[in-house]
């Protein structure tokens, strides 16, 4: 070892491989791939952006709040968690914004953070609560907007969500543990630990087609990849916070789902990098008849 040098793990991907997909965004946290062939992102003043894979940016709607995570249905409607409004809002392709879910049973959403659909159109939502208070929870919203608490015991700032292969479990980032847990969706069962980090703040998650889990860390500025045996590899790292600047959410995009797009809350752009293994396809349910 070189004298005076502290070694660290070598990332799998050099930062030079990352490119800017889109810039001029207002500190984007959420990013999602739509069934219409566009990338979607949000801004901290409520902006909703529709972005071509060539980088063309259009702001097509505004929630008026602070957009965190987002996903889409089969009719290209965007479902966005707005932490300032305390709601999951739905934005049509033409830009009309309405409330989809704000809580149930006398329990309002406190800090809605990330939504993900299953094949049946159930929308799972993380409600992070307040940092350090352990008051977060998971919700499930049925097609049409009626929701209920799914778990009260995933409370340590639940954040990014990813539906597991086969749809039998939900992987949940618990940012203040910090780590990732697996929540069974069929028949109840115990919450299981996927990985526990040290001195990191994980934020977003996404599966690839081989079942490996990509985890973006808000701090330090890293992306990790976890295999099916729970072994973690450093995928990318940016100690200068220029390419990956507080990376929050990430999504596999493009026609073949081989373009990994990363939102950098600390700056004004979306980054992208090509990967060898495509992402796991998402669900885009048709909800028009029940909404």
Regions found by a protein language model. Name each.
Residues 23-36, 43-45, 63-82, 87, ...:
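Beta-rich, blade/repeat-based domains predominating
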Residues 43, 52, 83, 92, ...:
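Structural signature of WD-repeat beta-propellers
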Residues 247-291:
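Blade-level signature of beta-propeller repeat domains, shared across WD40, Kelch, NHL, RCC1
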């Amino acid at each position: 070892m070189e004298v005076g040098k502290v070694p660290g793990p070598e990332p799998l991907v050099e930062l030079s491989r990352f490119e800017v997909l889109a810039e001029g965004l207002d500190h984007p946290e959420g990013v999602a791939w739509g069934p219409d062939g566009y990338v979607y992102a949000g801004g901290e003043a409520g902006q909703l952006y529709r972005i071509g894979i060539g980088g063309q940016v259009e702001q097509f709607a505004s929630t008026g709040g602070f957009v965190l995570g987002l996903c889409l249905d089969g009719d290209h409607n965007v479902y966005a968690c707005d932490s300032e409004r305390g709601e999951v809002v739905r934005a049509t392709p033409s830009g009309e914004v309405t409330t989809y879910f704000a809580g149930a049973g006398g329990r309002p959403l406190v800090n809605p953070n990330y939504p993900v659909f299953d094949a049946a159109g159930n929308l799972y939502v993380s409600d992070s609560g307040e940092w350090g208070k352990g008051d977060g929870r998971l919700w499930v919203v049925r097609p049409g907007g009626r929701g209920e608490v799914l778990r009260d015991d995933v409370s340590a700032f639940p954040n990014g969500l990813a539906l597991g292969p086969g749809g039998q479990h939900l992987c949940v980032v618990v940012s203040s543990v910090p780590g990732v847990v697996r929540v069974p969706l069929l028949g109840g069962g115990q919450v299981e630990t996927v990985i526990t980090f040290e001195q990191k703040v994980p934020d977003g998650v996404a599966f690839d087609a081989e079942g490996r889990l990509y985890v973006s860390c808000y701090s330090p500025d890293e992306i990790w990849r976890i295999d099916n045996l729970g072994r973690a590899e450093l995928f990318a790292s940016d100690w200068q916070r220029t390419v990956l600047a507080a990376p929050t959410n990430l999504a596999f995009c493009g026609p073949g789902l081989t373009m990994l797009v990363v939102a950098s809350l600390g700056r004004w752009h979306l980054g992208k990098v090509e990967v060898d293994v495509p992402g796991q396809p998402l669900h885009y349910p048709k909800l028009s008849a029940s909404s």
